[in-house]
């Protein structure tokens, strides 16, 4: 079903190969407005190719019924807005009747820049996108409609061209992460594996600290400890027998109290990495803890309520107060869309494109190579000063309470154990996000997509590492499926 140049040219090539091709077009070849597309369409009509112009719904159903594959080449990357006839009839018909649909560049009806579907859209089994993936295929409705993505190389020197062109983001392939799967050396001890302090929890949310701490340990940290309000410290101790818990003075509501800042900061100096935020609330004491940790000379991850504390401190947006978070040591912020919107004082963040833009405001304001914002969403973006990376996206089952606490713990364990990766922070964090995604796939397989809860992910971090390592080796052609090596 074509009204674009690529669709018509594809029909010519397929007919040369003996493939029985029917073309569905809204107009006669001579009526196509674009000169090059009109020329190709005329060539197509001159071949032994059946062209059906403006079929009714019933006529289209007959054509689809006899087709093994329907190629969707209706709209290109410039489409936006609402569908008009006949496409508002054809697209639902294809979705209802076709067994296999392959879309060219983007599924017709999808906005290639935002990933938004306003009316209806082709649901493709595969999308062959030309030259480079489009951001809309990863944003908003894009993943639901695009199916499996294949990038078509239209130019022999494409890599050289792409390197010279500004691009929104880079896709992280499994093989890019292969260096992170090296086995532990035999002479290692728990401290040289990296130590993590989890500053988290409250009487209302003790589970967040528990999940983050267990995840950091599963991700490889040799020594993990928790600093939590004394109102919930004993509960956390009972849940984590292998992890020390520091009881920090709390306020009347069971959150960090006024004396917490000095105590937490003194403890934090001894650790390879500090994770602050899960379940800690935004009490006055919690806000002081966040401010104090930002001043310390230690790698820091700010998650959940730590980010909400930042947003409350800088009511006009943290990008207007970069001195507050500009530091020498690594700083990672892990906001989801709503948290990110609060960090930039209410800028609308509702899809991948707006999330990247908001994250870049924060990063560029500080201008530090050590600051990375991980904008969490259906497709998570790792945003640094010079590059934006898109690691493997997880299943929908990861959209569950506590999943972010698990990811924060994985990030902390990863940062603590691999601090020598200072020249490529974004890729290191992509590895951590990918592990979280692999754990999500493993949990969905084990428990069913709708039944996954956050604690299911933690014990699957180890198997997730094995899956990720296998995919990395296969992506590089080092190990074939079924190999014993």
Regions found by a protein language model. Give the residues of each.
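Short, structured secondary-structure boundary patches
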Residues: 41-49, 76, 243-250, 396
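Acidic, amphipathic alpha-helical patches
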Residues: 1, 60, 264
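Internal gly/pro-rich beta-alpha loop/helix module
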Residues: 68-69, 74-167
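Positively charged, low-complexity/disordered segments
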Residues: 1-7
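Short, flexible loop segments at the rims of nucleotide/cofactor-binding pockets, characterized by
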Residues: 47-52, 78-83, 250-255, 277-280
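Nucleotide and nucleotide-moiety/phosphate-recognizing core
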Residues: 8-9, 13-74, 82-104, 288-289
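Short acidic loop-to-helix transition motifs that present clustered carboxylates
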Residues: 55-58, 108-112, 135-136, 306-309
């Amino acid at each position: 079903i074509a009204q674009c140049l690529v669709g018509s040219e594809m029909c010519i090539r397929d007919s040369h190969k003996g493939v029985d091709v029917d073309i569905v077009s809204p107009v006669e070849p001579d009526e196509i407005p674009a000169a090059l597309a009109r020329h190709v369409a005329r060539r197509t009509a001159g071949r032994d190719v059946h062209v059906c112009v403006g079929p009714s719904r019933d006529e289209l159903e007959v054509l689809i019924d006899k087709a093994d594959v329907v190629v969707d080449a209706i709209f290109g990357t410039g489409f936006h807005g609402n569908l008009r006839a006949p496409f508002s009839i054809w697209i639902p018909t294809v979705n209802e009747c076709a067994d296999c649909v392959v879309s060219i560049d983007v599924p017709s009806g999808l906005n290639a820049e935002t990933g938004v579907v306003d009316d209806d859209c082709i649901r493709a089994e595969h999308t062959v996108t030309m030259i480079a993936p489009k951001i809309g295929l990863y944003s908003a409705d894009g993943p639901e409609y695009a199916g499996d993505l294949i990038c078509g190389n239209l130019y022999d020197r494409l890599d050289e061209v792409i390197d010279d062109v500004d691009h929104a983001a880079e896709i992280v392939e499994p093989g890019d992460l292969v260096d992170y799967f090296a086995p532990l050396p035999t002479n290692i001890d728990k401290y040289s594996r990296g130590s993590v302090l989890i500053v988290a929890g409250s009487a209302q949310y003790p589970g967040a600290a528990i999940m983050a701490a267990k995840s950091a340990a599963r991700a490889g940290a040799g020594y993990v400890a928790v600093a939590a309000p004394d109102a919930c410290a004993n509960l956390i101790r009972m849940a984590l027998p292998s992890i020390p818990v520091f009881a920090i003075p709390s306020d009347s509501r069971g959150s960090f109290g006024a004396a917490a800042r000095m105590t937490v900061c003194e403890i934090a100096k001894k650790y390879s990495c500090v994770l602050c935020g899960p379940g800690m609330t935004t009490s006055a004491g919690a806000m002081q803890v966040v401010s104090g940790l930002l001043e310390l000379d230690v790698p820091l991850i700010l998650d959940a309520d730590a980010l909400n504390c930042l947003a409350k401190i800088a009511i006009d947006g943290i990008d207007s107060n970069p001195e507050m978070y500009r530091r020498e040591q690594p700083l990672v912020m892990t906001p989801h869309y709503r948290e990110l919107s609060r960090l930039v004082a209410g800028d609308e963040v509702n899809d991948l494109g707006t999330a990247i833009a908001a994250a870049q405001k924060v990063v560029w304001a500080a201008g530090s190579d050590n600051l990375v914002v991980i904008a969490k969403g259906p497709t998570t973006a790792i945003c640094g000063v010079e590059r934006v990376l898109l690691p493997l996206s997880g299943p929908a089952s990861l959209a569950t309470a506590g999943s972010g606490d698990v990811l924060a713990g994985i990030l902390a364990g990863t940062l603590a154990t691999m601090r020598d990766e200072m020249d490529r922070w974004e890729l290191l964090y992509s590895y951590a996000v990918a592990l979280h995604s692999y754990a999500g796939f493993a949990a969905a397989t084990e428990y069913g997509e709708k039944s996954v809860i956050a604690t299911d992910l933690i014990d699957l971090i180890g198997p997730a590492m094995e899956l990720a390592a296998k995919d990395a080796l296969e992506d590089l052609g080092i190990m074939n499926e079924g190999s014993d090596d």
